[in-house]
């Protein structure tokens, strides 16, 4: 089943977090989901010319404002000169959704192992008539040099302008899709070429992360147990003191 399911959705709530973090139980929840979709599409279209290398966009909501975290390989292209670009973008989004928008830009330290950026880079090369084999092999080599433990790239469509569509893939290292503790980054990108559209799928294995999560959970549980014991000890001492006071009062009477 791990071969078919989306690796990101398969790991949500365990080692991966949601890109939209907010809660609402009102009937207008569908409108907010639609707004998130509009925000992401607008930001990507707005910054496409600058080639900022946007890996992902996280959205958080409060009652008063909407906070957007943009993870970019080139944060300077998002911010602009003296913050002009990011201010204009926040104002435009505020007009669209009718709420105050706050934007934070986070730099992606290793863009070579971000699946979304790898897919976009391959799509850009295919649209500029670069050989698909060369683009795929170069992307895999760069990712493995940057520290990835495994990479798999699959391209499907009229590759090289062929009349009959086909699919080809290249792989290096290991990609444990069934292992939930495996941090597998996944992205799907479409390249619009003269011959037609080419679908690009990228899997990047960055190592296991659940061991650290288990340790953190165990530490939290130990702290809670200690707090309970301390609270129980304090309550026990208080009850013993109260009993001794009652006994002394009864003896005096």
Curated annotation (Swiss-Prot):
Ranges annotated as biased composition (Basic and acidic residues): 221-242
Gene Ontology molecular function, alphabetical: mRNA binding; rRNA binding; structural constituent of ribosome
GO cellular component terms, semicolon-separated: cytosolic small ribosomal subunit
Residue ranges, compositional bias (Basic residues): 243-253
Keywords, sorted A to Z: Ribonucleoprotein, Ribosomal protein, RNA-binding, rRNA-binding
Location of region: Disordered: 220-253
Residue span, KH type-2 domain: 39-109
Record PROSITE patterns: KH_TYPE_2, RIBOSOMAL_S3
Pfam families per UniProt: KH_2 (PF07650), Ribosomal_S3_C (PF00189)
CDD domains cross-referenced by the UniProt entry: KH-II_30S_S3
Domain of life: Bacteria
Entry-linked InterPro entries: KH_dom, KH_dom-like_a/b, KH_dom_type_2, KH_sf_prok-type, Ribosomal_S3_C_sf, Ribosomal_uS3_bac-typ, Ribosomal_uS3_C, Ribosomal_uS3_CS
GO biological process: translation
Role noted for this protein: Binds the lower part of the 30S subunit head. Binds mRNA in the 70S ribosome, positioning it for translation.
Quaternary data: Part of the 30S ribosomal subunit. Forms a tight complex with proteins S10 and S14.
Record-stated family: Belongs to the universal ribosomal protein uS3 family.
Full protein name: Small ribosomal subunit protein uS3
Organism of this sequence: Chlorobium chlorochromatii (strain CaD3)
